[in-house]
Amino acid sequence: MASQGTKRSYEQMETGGERQNATEIRASVGRMIGGIGRFYIQMCTELKLSDYEGRLIQNSITIERMVLSAFDERRNKYLEEHPSAGKDPKKTGGPIYRRIDGKWMRELILYDKEEIRRIWRQANNGEYATAGLTHIMIWHSNLNDATYQRTRALVRTGMDPRMCSLMQGSTLPRRSGAAGAAVKGVGTMVMELIRMIKRGINDRNFWRGENGRRTRIAYERMCNILKGKFQTAAQRAMMDQVRESRNPGNAEIEDLIFLARSALILRGSVAHKSCLPACVYGLAVASGHDFEREGYSLVGIDPFRLLQNSQVFSLIRPNENPAHKSQLVWMACHSAAFEDLRVSSFIRGKRVVPRGQLSTRGVQIASNENMETMDSSTLELRSRYWAIRTRSGGNTNQQRASAGQISVQPTFSVQRNLPFERATVMAAFIGNTEGRTSDMRTEIIRMMESARPEDVSFQGRGVFELSDEKATSPIVPSFDMSNEGSYFFGDNAEEYDN
């Protein structure tokens, strides 16, 4: 982006810091990661988890959820004011899985939130370390993005399920801050805005009074975040219109849906970060790795390196394929749910298959599932190459796309053609070009129609050998363009339910 000079890098957002140089950023991200690792080790000690149990991704997720719950101020306050039967607002917990006599057993644990906050602060040198909490939220969000489809949520807001590639970060909590906003897809922002406008249509007091003023500020801030994701002047001008509307209503919803569709070809800038489960950081800290001294980056080689030599396990249901479970977690670790499968396959060095062909359900185990038949296996999270994560949508280019997902949102800065079928996308634009945004709409449609096949994204960017940590000799992969590129193609994934 041209305005890069005024922007904080997303590592700075992640660590809440002001402008820093590269070394300082690496150190502060390292401090955040080290804090998560130390917290995890301490929790394993408290819960008396064996080494093997501490490497179980389901245990990691329970511990992560407990710390997020302990610091969820608004929900904690709500729980204290609206006591519900059988819920102690001061406690948090979840399932912990232990290996007993060659079988996996589930144990539901409860902990004082105060105690967890104390352990977290102690692991983070007495600081609140909100950046680490956000990092955990983004890992959970990336896992949801790879596991579930959001068809229902898309349809409910009047959008099209084929726009799923725009939905990154759709399950992130509101409190995820600037780092959270950076990883949200265009569709996610549009959906949040549409929900807000619909509330305003149904509730006449929504925009009024002192509360309404705060709502209005939030609305304009969300509009600005979305505007910042667009890379063309016409899309941004249209966002200004939506933001400045005196009384947002159906016209604004129409404009937002139009903009979301346009982002399938004129892609927005969406950040990607490799956020790993807490147990991976814990393992590294336990083996003596000093993240703050070594420095760490979420968008470079570091997460790949970490995954090359971490052994993480997962519970496996009777008819699940462990290799497929590994793919799911690998995609989540690298925020690659909406990446072109050909690019992911090349980097991973193993074929990455579409969601509909995976014989695996989500990573988390429901409380009513039978533990008797549960097995566990090692997750294969290693990669053949590494690539720099991107924060831009790249330029665009035509390619055959599918009935399910009709576009991708690149994760890795790797030179390639970006697949979408112009006819499919353009068919979505029949009709409405009147109203006060007509000239912008016309301009956006013109740009979409003239997107040329020879515009490849990320000119000259490639992947790197894992021994090439300074990214000196890029390998530009060649892709078989006849293969299917979309992950959610012909999909049968479960819906995401809170």
From Swiss-Prot:
Biological processes per GO annotation: symbiont entry into host cell; viral penetration into host nucleus
Positions of short motif Bipartite nuclear localization signal: 198-216
Source taxon at top rank: Viruses
GO cellular component, one term: host cell
Subcellular location: Virion; Host nucleus
Keyword Nucleotide-binding (UniProt): no
PTM entry text: Late in virus-infected cells, may be cleaved from a 56-kDa protein to a 53-kDa protein by a cellular caspase. This cleavage might be a marker for the onset of apoptosis in infected cells or have a specific function in virus host interaction.
InterPro entries: Flu_NP (IPR002141)
Motif residue range(s): Unconventional nuclear localization signal: 1-18
Keywords linked to the UniProt accession: Capsid protein, Helical capsid protein, Host nucleus, Host-virus interaction, Ribonucleoprotein, RNA-binding, Viral nucleoprotein, Viral penetration into host nucleus, Virion, Virus entry into host cell
MF-aspect GO terms: RNA binding; structural molecule activity
Region (Disordered): 1-21
Family: Belongs to the influenza viruses nucleoprotein family.
Subunit structure: Homomultimerizes to form the nucleocapsid. May bind host exportin-1/XPO1. Binds to viral genomic RNA. Protein-RNA contacts are mediated by a combination of electrostatic interactions between positively charged residues and the phosphate backbone and planar interactions between aromatic side chains and bases.
Role this protein plays: Encapsidates the negative strand viral RNA, protecting it from nucleases. The encapsidated genomic RNA is termed the ribonucleoprotein (RNP) and serves as template for transcription and replication. The RNP needs to be localized in the host nucleus to start an infectious cycle, but is too large to diffuse through the nuclear pore complex. NP comprises at least 2 nuclear localization signals that are responsible for the active RNP import into the nucleus through cellular importin alpha/beta pathway.
UniProt cross-references to HAMAP family, sorted A to Z: INFV_NCAP
Name of the molecule in the record: Nucleoprotein
Taxonomic source organism: Influenza A virus (strain A/Swine/29/1937 H1N1)
